[in-house]
Amino acid sequence: HELETVNSFEEIDFKSKNRFFLDISKGKNYKYKIAEPTKESGESILEALYLSLKLAKENKIDAINFAPFNKTSLKLGGNKYSDELQLMADKLDVKSFCCEFNVIDNFWTARVTSHIPIKEVASQITKENILKPIKLINEVMELNGIKNPRIAVQALNPHAEFGTEEKDEIIPAIEEAKKLGLNTDGPLPCDTSFVVAYKNKNHDCMVGMYHDALQSGLKAFGFDRGVTVQGGLTVPITTTAHGSAFDIAGKNIANLEPLLNSFKI
């Protein structure tokens, strides 16, 4: 199929077999530098993202798929949000709970906390906060055709016992989820959770308490396949689970599989 360049969204013919590139530069001469964060590249990213979200909000498009953003470029370009999910939720007027999902080989993960300092994590581990991603990942997986998904829940502390959060918050959240009919199991100690849940195929998904407890396992097992799904929004939005990979930019050696996987989801 041919790639056509258009200057407005209205020029796109969705019945055509061709692919369309929407040029939003409007004559601007952005000065990009390969493998280097710049104010101009950040502004360009935000402009494209804002337009995509606007089109989604107006029901003119059904989904958004994007390549990795460089967070430094976004900040230089004027982004004031802590992460992309917060930005997207705000622009789409979503007030309910949102959560970033990561996927490898149809194994999904969700987090209770995300981009916050480790020292702040424990205070956020409450029964109510744990139930939110459990409910959401169950809902989203069922929408993706996985009925009654087997949900593993990670512990917070080493061996699920060096602290009180498991007894006071995590186990009560798991028990409450079971009362709601959700197929939950845990808490699983973090250091073996991916072997039990993912490698041994005992679960379909896993909810973790903080960012690196999940991301380290995901990237160890499937860095070259991982997908990120922005959960809880009004439109499906996906990207790769890896970053912008400036270390290999321009070398023509990038692996396309993660981006293709994110597009398929």
Where do the model's predicted regions map?
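Anion-binding alpha/beta catalytic cores of soluble intermediary-metabolism enzymes, centered on
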Residues: 1-265
